[in-house]
Amino acid sequence: MRKKTVALVMTAALMGSICLTGCGKSTDDTSKETTTAKQAESKKDDAVSVDQEKADEVADLIDAIYVQERNDNTDKQCSDAKAAWDKLTDAQKELVEGENADPDYFGRDTGDASKDDARNQDEIGENEILVVSFGTSFNDSRVADIKGIEDALQTAYPEWSVRRAFTAQIIINHVQARDGEKIDNVEQALERSVSNGVKNLVIQPTHLMHGAEYDELMEVVENYKDKFESVKIAEPLLGEVGSDAAVINEDKKEVAEILTKEAVSEAGYDSLDAAKEDGTAFVFM
C-alpha cells in the first residue's frame, strides 16, 4: 500500500512538472502576453485611425475645390490640397474618399502637363483670338486636341495673339491643383484682354453645338462688349443652320457620315446597305 501511495505521489509530481514544462507558461506569463497582444492590436487600430484621419483631411480639401465658382481663396485651396496630398504615404493615399474626392484626383497619370501652354500671357496687342473650350484635365488629350487647335490658329493668323479660356471651373481647379498650371476662365481671360488694351476680339469656341456652356459664354461676353471696338463670336462647329430645311450644314453632314460609318462597323456590318437588309436601324441621340 505504501508503495502504491509513493507511486501515486511521484506520478502527480511528474504530471505537474510536465504540465508546467509542456504548457510552458505560468498564469502570470499568459496574462502578460494577452496584455501585450491587446496593446499591439490597439496600436495597430490607432495607426489605421490616424491614416484615415489624414486621408479624410485631404478628401475634404479636394471636395472644397472640386465644384465651385472661382473666389479669392481658390488659388490657396488648390495649393493646400496638393501639399496635403504630397505628405500622405502611399497607403494613406489609397484611403482618400470623399463626396467627389478619390485617389485618382491627384494620383492618376494623364500625361505631361509641361507640354501644354496655358496661353495666359499678357502683351496681347490690339488683336486677339480667344479660344474657349470646356476643357479637360487629361494632359495628353489637352495638348493634342485643345492646344493643337490653338497652335493651328496661331499659325494661320500670325498677326493676332491667340489666348485660351476654359468654361469649366472644375477642370481649371483640377489642372491647377495637380499640375500647377493656371488656365483662365472666361471672365479672367476677358479681364486680361481689357487690361492689355485689346481692341478687336474674336472668340472661337471649340464646343460642338449650342448648349448650356455656349449660352453661358454668350452671357459673360455680353457684359464686356462695350470694352472693345469689335467683338465677334463664332458659332459652335455643328451650330450653324441653313435658311430652311433644304440647306444642310456641310460640317453636320460630314460628322453624320463618319458616325454612321463607325456605328455600322461596330455593329459588325460591312456597309449600311448590309445593315438595312438585316433589318437593323441606327438611332443617333
Question: Where do the protein language model's features map onto the residues?
Answer:
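Extended amphipathic ligand-handling, pore-lining, and cofactor/metal-binding catalytic surfaces
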Residues: 47-50, 102-285
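Short, flexible helical or helix-coil boundary motifs
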Residues: 16, 65-69, 197
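Low-complexity, Pro/Thr/Ser/Glu-rich flexible segments characteristic
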Residues: 29-49
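Bacterial Sec-dependent N-terminal signal peptides
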Residues: 1-9
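Bacterial lipoprotein signal-peptidase II cleavage site
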Residues: 19-32
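Beta-rich interaction/scaffold domains
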Residues: 45-109
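Hydrophobic core
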Residues: 10-20
